[in-house]
Amino acid sequence: KILKKNRIILVEDACESIGAKYKNKFLGTFGDFSTFSFYFSHQISSVEGGMICCKNKEDENIIKSLRSHGWSKDLSNQKKIENKFKKINKRFLFINSGFNFRPTDIQAAIGLSQFNSLNDFIKTRKINRDKIITKLVLDKRWKNQVSFINNNNSIKPSWFGLSMLLNKKYKNKKNIIFNKLDKLGVENRPIMSGNFLKQPALRKYYLKQKSKDFPNANFIHEHGLFVGLKNRILSQIETKKFANIFFKAFDV
């Protein structure tokens, strides 16, 4: 209702949520457009690049043109455009400003080949997440060092990684913990960019909103921790190794 009333175009940033559902509807199908990332740590990986989804042919043609220098090539209305601009060689007919965002053939092939396995990847990541959490909380060294993000019945998650929130005791030791995890062989990162209003890139826009106005985003910024999940089932040896590293990192 808000979108229609204000004539707003909604672009869903669903970059890490491919396959996830809210009220039995896929994330990425609520807005006019949605974006997904196929970076190497994601559920599907083409090393770089990703996918844009839209709802009609007109928007699809615009996106295809924008990704390819504004070219008319391979559009569903290509013939119509060529007939409109007959004085321009149809092989090099540019109808828009644009970018060079086309994947290489090998990247596209790698990405497309994984779609048939997506549901298996999602199931495997959930199994790995459950195995890691169970291993941690049943360990005698477990002292609620972190809390885990849980979902309700309305949500069917597609876990990108194992997201955690540090206990307030460790808030000021976050960077030490991150560095110890790195040195012990567990790659990690904050939960995305945290409160994006803290990022220097936004300073040039002189926004009225201040980072302090978003306490929940600030909490995630200060307490959030991500570690990766694999697309194959972890062994008992691997989960035990992770647990040992986890508790060593939090021994600060």
Regions found by a protein language model. Give the residues of each.
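Adenylate-forming
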Residues: 45-50, 109-111
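Active-site core of PLP-dependent enzymes with the aminotransferase class I/II
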Residues: 1-9, 19-22
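Short, well-ordered coil/turn segments that N-cap beta-strands
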Residues: 8, 32, 223-225
